[in-house]
Amino acid sequence: MFSLIKFILAMLHTSNDIRNPGLRILPPGVERYFVRGGGLSIIEVLPEDKIEIINEEGRQICEIIVFNSKGKSDLSILNLKENANADFSKKTIANDEKISKLLKNKNLDLNNAKSSIVFSEDCMMGEKITLTSKDKCVVMIAAPGDAMNVHEQNPPTDLTIFLNKAKFIETDEQFILPDPLSDPIIEQLVKRRTAETYEVKAGEYIQIIDPGGRQCSDFLAFDTRKLNDGIESIIDDKATRTFMGGAYPGPGLFSKFYDGDHEAMIEVVRDTVGRHDTFNLACTSKYYEDMGYMGHINCTDNFNNRLDKYDINSRKSWSAINLFFNTAIDANNVASFDEPWSRPGDYVLFRALKDLTCISSACPCDVDGANGWNPTDIFVRTYSKEKKYSKAIAFRMKTDSEPKLTQETGFHKKTSELTRNFVEYKGFWLANNFTNSGTIKEYTACRERAIATDLSPLRKFEILGPDAENLMQYTLTRNVKKLSVGQVVYTAMCYENGCMLDDGTLFKLGQDNFRWIGGDEYSGEWLKEQAKKKNYKVWIKSATDHIHNIAVQGPNSRKILEKFVWTPPIQPSITELEWFRFNIARIDHETGTPIVISRTGYTGELGYEIWCHPKDAAEVWDKVWEAGKEFDITPLGLEALDMVRIEAGLIFYGYEFDDQTDPFEAGIGFTVPLKTKEDDFIGKEELIKRKANPQKN
């Protein structure tokens, strides 16, 4: 299971943040942290500080360990009683070299630590506990849980922590410096309105961090070997845009910056912002003089001064990579800029492809919105080439959500052997097409033979409890009460105005047990909000990280699955499985790897979806591939999937519908049984009006 350990640095969010869009609004002295399900977090606490722990989704125990100033376990500091041996935290940390080293450096004695378990296994959504600290301490908070069997509905889920500081300094600025990715080679603070140089070797990594948010940082990189020969070879923005086919590179296939000799200099590995500039110059004296600000500090002069020691010629302007600079060109060919998208702690991670001499600035512009009207510091770290870092952008479900780096699906190990063309979708890397097939061949294989495609980014939620059916009947347009156990239904999920929030499929696993498979993560938040409003006794548990899936589609898909899918006598076999039904199955035999098979798909062909835990995904892929060789099975990427689903008349958010489209306009009016569903549901009244008076033709 992937590491979910995080050592927390201070994150102060004050009431003044309301002036800065996109930043969290919390009372002065309140900090917010998260504990991922199946992981743990560590925070430093001072006397009289209050810790509020919220069990967001319920049915999740919490393990707490407290270390006093001497590094010894002391639960009494938080008025907690010992009732466990901290087994989960000890096991988790033992498997993580980085956090083990960190605890050792802080002299925290985990081996002899005891813990307190708070929250019951049946606690409700939103249940909370507040603890007050008697003394300075380090608190380790865990959300214990193992990998969820796909036949079960008990994923470990997140906890939210609010730390109310007894003493704090109120400030208008936030400053978040994320933990180092590993042991840094260089740590360089670039103070506001200045620039700093640094050198890296080929293969090493450069992390440029915006600790305060909304701060531009101009970046230059010189080829060190050429520089030693008196040649000033730097990143060429035009060459880069030409070769990469975009305004600037990003993580993935088109990720490199080039010099004027068409040689790659650096590669973008991670980018948590996704908005930069390669069209404009680093700010110059002329820029400010033209606005009437004579003698204003500027990045060009700062660069010239700092680069002088390398005998680099001064220039009137530098064509830099303007990190975090938010620029755009509109439909009328007018260039514009606005405040940066970067938030406190956001960063870009580069990998040097040559020995480089670099310089980074903390732009001094304070006369417009380029730096949010308030220049702040930049922080640079470099890392050894020995450790590899995943390629990623940051995914945020909501504006105040904790950013999540792009993940690899459980099937990525297998699909990455067949292609390098991956695109980011909903926080995951998915194959766009495959190297030895291509879009047309993949499309043809789906229509004539069989394909397998990775659809793991679909959001999964376990809906449990005595009011589970009532909640789904109220929030979905379909008549959920007509579902039998083992049945799947495709449905819309609407707002009160009748427009669509999401579409997806609902699995009925038991009388009070459902599994919602949707396209958007917010659908889970919506379900929680409605459950709270209706005071339903129900749990909505996030399960996306525990259930990944591939679709096996095409005329030969049934024959492929028949070769390796075992089902108990009480379940329908693959041959018997009807349209929009699922079975509880295993691979090969009754003690084989657990899977769920549904006769569903997104292609219009005969097809099935196989659902499994990510740790079992490689085995599932191999089984499908081995069984499919006889039928010339082909992997299918997003490009070909788009072709087959359009031909089949299957809709996709952002294309055929959005939050201003009702189900009738989207072409799925069949999911709204207004005449036969007597119970009320969200949007029903408006949908009756919209059906009688269509808004769009």
What does each model-identified segment do?
Residues F2-K391:
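Intrinsically disordered, low-complexity segments enriched in small/polar residues
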